[in-house]
């Protein structure tokens, strides 16, 4: 009985996570500047170069290659930081729906 309940709860949690991932993601060029600044504030990202690159991506909608060339950062590193900000945004979204 306990295992069945655990598996059911795990399935529900996985479905909620998938729903959250699809219904709330930061989209390039669609993030409000104020929301972006708040996300950066709660993140561990402190490099101005990386912050400006992320702003170009999320707020201004520029493509990754152009951003990396302009800000002199590695595409792989930019991808990691994009993922980091996406993860923070998802956590905040999930917290806000638990209240």
Curated annotation (Swiss-Prot):
Keywords per UniProt: Fimbrium biogenesis, Plasmid, Transcription, Transcription regulation
Pfam families in the record: PapB
Gene3D superfamilies according to UniProt: 1.10.10.2690
Chain coiled-coil ranges: none
GO biological process: regulation of DNA-templated transcription
TM spans (from-to): none
Domain of life: Bacteria
UniProt keyword Metal-binding, yes or no: no
Signal peptide: none
Function: Trans-acting protein involved in the regulation of the biogenesis of K99 fimbriae (FanC).
Protein name: Regulatory protein FanB
């Amino acid at each position: 009985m306990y295992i069945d309940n655990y598996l059911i709860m795990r399935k529900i949690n996985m479905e909620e996570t998938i729903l959250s991932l699809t219904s709330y993601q930061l989209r390039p060029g669609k993030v409000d500047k104020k929301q972006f600044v708040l996300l950066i504030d709660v993140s561990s990202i402190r490099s101005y170069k990386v912050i400006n690159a992320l702003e170009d991506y999320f707020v201004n909608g520029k493509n990754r290659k152009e951003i990396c060339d302009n800000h002199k950062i590695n595409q792989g590193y930019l991808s990691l930081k994009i993922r980091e900000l996406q993860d923070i945004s998802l956590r905040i979204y999930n917290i806000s729906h638990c209240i």
